Amino acid sequence: MYEGKHIHFSEVDNKPLCSYSPKLCKQRRLNGYAFCIRHVLEDKTAPFKQCEYVAKYNSQRCTNPIPKSEDRRYCNSHLQVLGFIPKKERKKKNDPIDEVKVRHQMDTMAFSLTVPTLALKMPNGLDGMSLSPPGARVPLHYLETELEDPFAFNEEDDDLKKGATVRKKLQSKLAQNRQRQRETEILKVRQEHFSPPPAPSQQQPPQQHSHLSPLSTSLKPPAPPQGSVCKSPQPQNTSLPMQGVAPTTHTIAQARQLSHKRPLPLLPSSRAPTVDPPRTDRILMKATAFSPHFSCISRLQRLVKLCTQKHQLDTDLFPHLGLDWSEESGEEPEDSEQASPYQVAWSIRETLRYQRHASDDDDAESRSSRVTQLCTYFQQKYKHLCRLERAESRQKKCRHTFRKALLQAASKEPECTGQLIQELRRAACSRTSISRTKLREVEPAACSGTVKGEQCANKALPFTRHCFQHILLNHSQQLFSSCTAKFADGQQCSVPVFDITHQTPLCEEHAKKMDNFLRGDNSRKVQHQQQRKPRKKTKPPALTKKHKKKRRRGPRRPQKPIPPAVPQGNLSMPASVSLPVEASHIRSPSTPELSADELPDDIANEITDIPHDLELNQEDFSDVLPRLPDDLQDFDFFEGKNGDLLPTTEEAEELERALQAVTSLECLSTIGVLAQSDGVPVQELSDRGIGVFSTGTGASGIQSLSREVNTDLGELLNGRIVHDNFSSLELDENLLRSATLSNPPTPLAGQIQGQFSAPANVGLTSATLISQSALGERAFPGQFHGLHDGSHASQRPHPAQLLSKADDLITSRQQYSSDHSHSSPHGSHYDSEHVPSPYSDHITSPHTTSYSGDNMAATFSAEMPIMAQHLLPTQLEVPLGGVVNPRTHWGNLPVNLGDPSPFSNLLGADGHLLSTSLSTPPTTSNSETTQPAFATVTPSSSSVLPGLPQTSFSGMGPSAELMASTSPKQQLPQFSAAFGHQLSSHSGIPKDLQPSHSSIAPPTGFTVTGATATSTNNASSPFPSPN
């Protein structure tokens, strides 16, 4: 069995319901299928087909199912619309159309009877009535039985009320027969009724007293001029217009009747003013039986009473004749029975119009049914017009009768008539005064409230004695209430408010404030979020600085970048031993005189109370910022409470790229020395894409590299990377893994640009060879197959020669450093020579001058890139003489060369061993120039650097000249917590890269060099460890 998507069950008996897929259907399923009869077409196996009717207004096909066994194309509803089957009609209770059918034995076209047919062809014998008005020609049985006034309180006889639905037609026939007999009797005695004797009488049963009292409720109650009909002694006597009064139909009479019981065949009293001889419940009274005084006064009084009743009835229950029509009343059969004929006619006409529009395009619509509907409408309309005509004629005759009765009473009993007229006028005046009083109450009066002891001049609200401002003084009113808002001082707002929809009504002023407040919440949130970005310019404390989440960029070094064609002067940097700076003119915020422990108490308390993981908003600075010291240069924003750095990921990436770029430049400068020492021709290295940078002894020193090295390096040098980002960068001594490095302070050659308030100095150092012991053999593995010779042992210079070359190199570099420091004024830019990119495959040297007498040139194969071997002694110790309380970080830093991991990632992608030196300026001015020297080293072992040829290292002797510099005590905050995951692989970076906060700057020119020798396939022979 196929099922839809919605599988659900009944909450009553837990039986499965229709599983219609598009929407949830709660109908019962058909037996054997998972759908109801409405949605069974979703199951293609069901024996049903779809209706073929297509709507014209939306071109959608009908979705009703049709059994396949039936030979038809449309469902039942559209068969009716198309006119193939008759439409179902709701059978109304005591439908007058059915009575017409029974009475006249008409077929379905009986509704097309025209007005002449209804007036002249009726079989009830009324065709020849000449004295009755035109309205009397309407079929009485049709107008009198069902289409009556809704306020007539008509009730059928007991036999009709108790009759069942099956006996309705039979009862209707019996009632019609009785009415025909009555009409025949009326025609027989019509001449006697209009005879001169003033003794006409009217049949009036006792149960019709209340029915006849308001019968003559017209504009003027009629009164018989000659006599009256009196009832038997039990009921009160009433009089009705008799002679000379044109009869009116019983339908209009029932509009005023209040009785609960009346015989159905009873003729209208105005139509039947004659005496019915067989009746014994009525007494015929002649005018001579009473005195003239009694008859005239009593008749007039009765007319006055009827007039009063008529006025009350019209005042209270005036919506007769269709004026109380309601659309809802036509929907239910019970209400439709009480509707007036014209209401029914109007509703039928509207229905007919709607059906005309709906079926204009329907050619199969039955013409007979449309003709029938149209005739029904005209018939109802004709009946309504007849009622209006009868009512108007009756009003005229009633006024005439009243005038006659008043004239007769005044002529015979003037005093009594005068008193009666006075009473009528008094009653009319009282009614007029009451209406005027009501009008006065509606008129606005002055407010009864007082303002500062004076009467309020405003007009009062309708039906009140107070204006809008003082309406709350009226405690009985329920519409107005006081504003529920309060002012800032706690005073309750007393403005009246007309608000019946809210629990807490607000006056106009407070309502606007509330709306603005609610709207401002969202706008303020948006504004705060937009203002957070500009606020970053004002360097908030590190605790409140949010780490910016940004997609990490990959390595920015392309495979083959194109060097810039135009020299960039601002990006140049000399490849000298160090870059000095005049510390007397530049004060670095990275060496603050105010430490974390020396903070004011209030700031320290604030920092202690704020947790690290709490995100602060801008509003939280209102209490913290006023407490900060005035001199913010002494306050390090990048240092936390415990000295922990809180840098961002961007800072780490910029630092890493800068270090790699600086190391590449240093390696390039080192290549020049090694190439000259190993005897490789300069031209060959240039052809292989390796620039040789050399400087003779008589030259000014190693020439500075002036081409654009890297975008990040240029930004670092020119201040586009804010120097404060690196003001607190200090490496943990644990990163070097139990190694000792001693860095004596050296003078800083050159000057930093003026835009660096206190930047980190970048020193590009070349190889410095200082050694007093024999230089061991250095061999490259056999893959260096492009060397000049397999062994070249004879061409290899003596170690003593290497030492002499190293001494000359040191002397030349120091000379260059001193010269360059004097040539560059304070705040000047670097030299703008073009520096080739370290990432380029082809690097040419702007200076091809080689050292005089240098035989240290090396030849390398094109397949193997040049790798600068950094000579890192196992233990380098240089005492910091004269330093007050020297820290271990700068005094003794052990470097264990047995562990190759610290240097594993010092190789760049192009094969160069990366080495950098960053230094911060010292706090004191140093005028002396000292040589960087290494301490005596006792190498315990030598290890093979990963990715490098096996190399033997030799220790170097210390220099005799050391400079002692005094400086305040340093505090090195931990850097590994922030940069450990990124710089752990770069732990081979010398300690001079660690910027200091408040002590002597690390040596600017700490140099490590790589000494290479040519060998074909010899492995490294480690040095013996001297004890």
From Swiss-Prot:
An example Gene Ontology CC term for this record: nucleoplasm
Tagged with keyword Nucleotide-binding: no
Phosphoserine found at: S132
Region feature (Disordered): 193-278, 519-574, 813-850, 914-969, 982-1027
Single GO biological process annotation from the record: positive regulation of DNA repair
Assigned keywords, A-Z: DNA damage, DNA recombination, DNA repair, Isopeptide bond, Nucleus, Phosphoprotein, Transcription, Transcription regulation, Ubl conjugation
Compositionally biased region (Basic residues): 525-559
InterPro entries: Potential_DNA-bd (IPR025927)
Keyword Manganese applies: no
Biased composition (Polar residues): 229-257, 937-954
Domain of life of the native organism: Eukaryota
Segments of skewed composition (Low complexity): 201-216, 914-932, 1001-1027
Location in chain, cross-link Glycyl lysine isopeptide (Lys-Gly) (interchain with G-Cter in SUMO2): K87
One protein family per Pfam: zf-C3Hc3H
Compartments (UniProt record): Nucleus
Principal location listed in the UniProt entry: nucleus
Family (UniProt): Belongs to the INO80D family.
Protein's job: Putative regulatory component of the chromatin remodeling INO80 complex which is involved in transcriptional regulation, DNA replication and probably DNA repair.
Subunit details: Component of the chromatin remodeling INO80 complex; specifically part of a complex module associated with the N-terminus of INO80.
PANTHER family: INO80 COMPLEX SUBUNIT D, PTHR16198
Protein name per its UniProtKB record: INO80 complex subunit D
Organism name: Homo sapiens (Human)
Lineage of the species this protein comes from: Eukaryota, Metazoa, Chordata, Craniata, Vertebrata
Gene: INO80D
